[in-house]
């Protein structure tokens, strides 16, 4: 008498969540500035002098004036023009001090090239496409705040201004680090392509029919 086999319990349904994606439409792979031991992001603005802070603020504001061209950001360009006039003495002094600093490290033409190379890095830093919108909004706020900063106060305020323009980029880098951590965890659990293998459990193994070997039948000679 043939015994009845219980139907095997189907394997559990595994719902795979969407694979994490980069923030703000960023590339799947990109390098972001590392963090120092104290958690400070080591960007091009990390550990710089007051004169370099002033000049990096100028560079960042210049990028905003050129790139934030939507109608709602019109005050940025007007604010930048005012900035160049009102704080011209601080800017001139900072530029001369920066030149002198590079000349202590390089000689002749090499000092000019070194400064231009560094400054290109600064411009590129503030031109990161995924951060455009939040950067322009920060530049709007800085433009309004500059109206209250006296020329005699600008050198000290430049640290505040640069930090505000840099903040959207630091937030993006933090978000990108989180994306990479989330992606690594997702791939560890679901595989690089989201394909997983569900192995049968003990109940399913026991419920499988046992295949009996068939006896061989002698063939007629």
Region annotations inferred by a language model:
Residues 47-70:
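Alpha-helical bundle segments that constitute or directly flank the non-heme di-iron/ferroxidase center
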Residues 197-221:
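Short, low-complexity, Pro/Ser/Thr/Gly-rich segments in the mature regions of secreted, periplasmic
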Residues 41-55, 78, 82-85:
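Short, solvent-exposed segments of well-ordered alpha helices
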Residues 108-200:
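A charged, amphipathic interaction segment
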Residues 68-132:
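Mid-length scaffold segments of soluble, non-membrane domains
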Residues 15-46, 52:
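Post-signal-peptide N-terminal segment of Sec-exported extracytoplasmic proteins
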Residues 1-15:
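Bacterial Sec signal peptide processing site at the extreme N-terminus
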